[in-house]
Curated annotation (Swiss-Prot):
UniProt-recorded name of the protein: UDP-N-acetylglucosamine--N-acetylmuramyl-(pentapeptide) pyrophosphoryl-undecaprenol N-acetylglucosamine transferase
Keywords, ordered alphabetically: Cell cycle, Cell division, Cell inner membrane, Cell membrane, Cell shape, Cell wall biogenesis/degradation, Glycosyltransferase, Membrane, Peptidoglycan synthesis, Transferase
Single annotated GO MF: undecaprenyldiphospho-muramoylpentapeptide beta-N-acetylglucosaminyltransferase activity
A Pfam family that the UniProt record links to this protein: Glyco_transf_28
Pathway: Cell wall biogenesis; peptidoglycan biosynthesis
Source taxonomy: Bacteria, Pseudomonadati, Pseudomonadota, Gammaproteobacteria, Vibrionales
Organism, scientific name: Vibrio vulnificus (strain CMCP6)
Gene behind the chain: murG
Length: 355
């Protein structure tokens, strides 16, 4: 009896790493592959991955930045320990390949796979390569990038995006005959965004009627944000901690106001929705660079956080009529690269056939 091929996915920390990994895993499961995950027990993958029917192994590893002198002194020993933990999991399960999608777990996991003679495939979701992927790229058999600029020569394939988002009807079909209030979806990513939670109630109070709002506030923030809208006198608002059916929310929206994490940018494009991006402040402008191509093609606007004011954001929203929003949505959909999951899955299959 022929043995099924096996893939170990290394990804954790945020939805931007985990969801693309799940998308690739699903493609390979459809081809009969067995999938196992390597993650950390205290991050979102510990709860999310098993819900998708995938077993997960854990290692103990944390980031190195901003942890103080004691942490930096201990870091080499903790990294070595994490590599040995990962190597033990790999030896026990014997994967045919490993896929690194980012997060702290990918570093020790990728090195352990390399030491074990297992081919490593990397996918960098952001326009600026993370520290882990920057180093792992030197030992990986295949490297992909979602946006130009992360690596010099790696193929640009976009981000793996959930199938229900890709399958949404064309923006023309969804939006052409809409009338009435402009629908604004506010999203701060899986962790929420305090700056959006604080700013949007004031923005909508200034804009007045003619809008409907759905606001994803993040864990533990929904009551506070709901109260802020009430105190600002804003009606027609739904506030939630999380959005379970994100595809349905994209289909509903005329405009997104959101961060520009890698997965959000790719989903906005795949769905075909115009956006105003408020990038998270980072020293290498990672989120701003993620969204640059959508701004350049007319699919989005961007206000970097130091320039964000209630007046400025309200003014930008006020300019966007239905014709402009439809045009932005069409440009977003035209810029989408929706087959990254298949491209990465095919590369993994090809690598294992060469062994």
């Amino acid at each position: 009896m022929k043995k099924n091929k096996r893939l170990m996915v290394m990804a954790g920390g945020t939805g931007g790493h985990v969801f693309p990994g799940l998308a690739v895993a699903k493609k390979l499961q459809q081809q009969g592959w067995e999938i196992r995950w390597l993650g950390t027990a205290d991050r979102m993958e510990a709860e999310l991955v098993p819900k998708h029917g995938i077993d997960i192994d854990f290692i103990k590893v944390k980031g190195l930045r901003g942890q103080g002198i004691k942490r930096l002194v201990l870091a080499p020993f903790q990294i070595l320990n994490a590599i040995f933990q990962a190597k033990a999991h790999i030896k026990r399960w014997q994967p045919d390949a490993v896929l690194g999608m980012g997060g702290y777990v990918s570093g020790p996991g990728g090195i352990a796979a390399w030491l074990s003679g297992i081919p490593v495939v990397l996918h960098e979701q952001n326009a600026v390569a993370g520290l882990t992927n920057h180093w792992l790229a030197k030992i990986a058999k295949k490297v992909f990038q979602a946006f130009p600029g992360a690596f010099k020569d790696a193929p640009v394939v976009g981000n793996p995006v959930r199938e229900d988002v890709v399958a949404l009807p064309d923006p023309m079909q969804r939006m052409q005959d809409r009338e009435g209030a402009i629908r604004i979806l506010v999203m701060g990513g899986s962790q929420g965004a305090r700056i959006l939670n604080q700013t949007m109630p004031q923005v909508m109070a200034q804009l007045g009627s003619g809008f409907e709002i759905r606001h994803q506030a993040g864990k533990g923030s929904a009551d506070e944000v709901r109260l802020a809208y009430q105190q600002a006198g804003v009606e027609h608002v739904e506030v939630s901690e999380f959005i379970d059916d994100v595809a349905a929310q994209y289909a509903w929206a005329d405009l997104l106001v959101c961060r520009s994490g890698a997965l959000t940018v790719s989903e906005v494009s795949a769905a075909g929705v115009g956006a105003i991006f408020i990038p998270f402040m980072h020293k290498d402008r990672q989120q701003a660079l993620n969204a640059d191509h959508l701004v350049a093609c007319g699919a989005a606007l961007m206000i970097e956080q130091p320039q964000l004011t209630v007046d400025k954001l309200a003014g930008e929203i006020q300019k966007l009529g239905r014709d402009t929003l439809l045009s932005m949505a069409l440009h977003a959909r035209a810029a989408a690269q929706n087959n990254a999951d298949q491209v990465v899955a095919d590369a993994i299959v090809a690598l294992t056939e060469q062994k």
